[in-house]
C-alpha cells in the first residue's frame, strides 16, 4: 500500500487518503526507529508495488494471506524480500502454510498502541458500550444484539464510531446507511461517524464494554488492543488472530459461521456479563483491575526496540 524508502514515505493510490491501522503502524515505525536505520532500508507495508535494488526490501504484512494482492509471494516470490514482518504469529503461520517461505526469514512484531493501562474507578451509572472499527467487521450483528439487550437492561448505551472514510472510501458507506440510521433512531445508541483517534480514545476511557461480534477475519486488532488497555471488558469470538491479540485479557466465545448462531452466542455471553455487573457492584472493577490488561508486548517502547534491532541486523547482513 505504501513504502518507507530510505526514510521517506512513498504513497500509493490506496494509501494516500487512508488513516487506518496500517498507516498508524507506519507512523509508529517512523517515530520510533532511528532515522539512520530507516535510511538504509525499504519497508513495504503490504501490497508492494516497486522493489528497490540499492537497499534491502522488507515486507511488513498487515493483510490476510489469502488476499489476492499477495500474488507477488507465489512460486517463491518471497525470495525478492530480505525479510518479512508479521503482526501476529497466527498471521505468520498462515503465510508460511500458503507460500512456503522459511520461518528464518520471518519475524513477528505485534502492533503497538499509545494507550497506557491505568486502572481507575469508572462511573457505573450508565454502562457504556463502544464500537470503533469499520462497519463490515461486525456492526450488522452488534446492533440487533444490543437492541435486544437494551430491552432488558435500561442503563446501557452504545456509542458507534465507524465509517469507511478512515480508508478514504466514503462511497462504501452507502450499504450501511440504513444501519447507521437505525442506530441514530435508537434511544440507547448514538452514531458518531468517523472521529479522530484521540476522540475515540477519550470515549474508551469512559466506557465499559467492547462487544465485538467479529465476522471479518483479523490478522490483529488495534481496536481490541485499545479497548483492553482502556480497562474495558471485551467480548468477541475466537476467530482469526483475535485470541492471540486478546492475550487472555478478554471473554471469548466459539466462532460460528451461521450469523444467527453467532449473534445468539454474543447476546448470551453479554447478557451474562451484564447480569453479573447488576448483581455484583464490584464485578467490573474486579475483572478489569488486572496485570493482564497491561499488554506489555503492545507498548510503543517494545515495538520500537524490536524494529530497531531487526532493521540493524538486516542492514548489517546486507552490507556483508
Question: At which residue positions do the language-model features occur?
Answer:
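A charged, aromatic-enriched C-terminal amphipathic alpha-helix characteristic of glycosyltransferases
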Residues: 19-24, 264, 268, 281-318
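Nucleotide-activated donor-binding/catalytic signature segment of Leloir-type glycosyltransferases, i.e.
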Residues: 173-198
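Acidic donor-binding loop of glycosyltransferase active sites
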Residues: 205-219, 232
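Conserved donor-binding/catalytic core segment of Leloir-type glycosyltransferases
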Residues: 121-138, 143-146, 150, 159
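Short hydrophobic beta-strand element within catalytic cores of glycosyltransferases
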Residues: 233-236, 243
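N-terminal pre-catalytic "stem/leader" segment of glycosyltransferase-like enzymes
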Residues: 1-51
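Donor nucleotide-sugar binding/catalytic pocket of nucleotide-sugar-dependent glycosyltransferases
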Residues: 82-96, 101-118
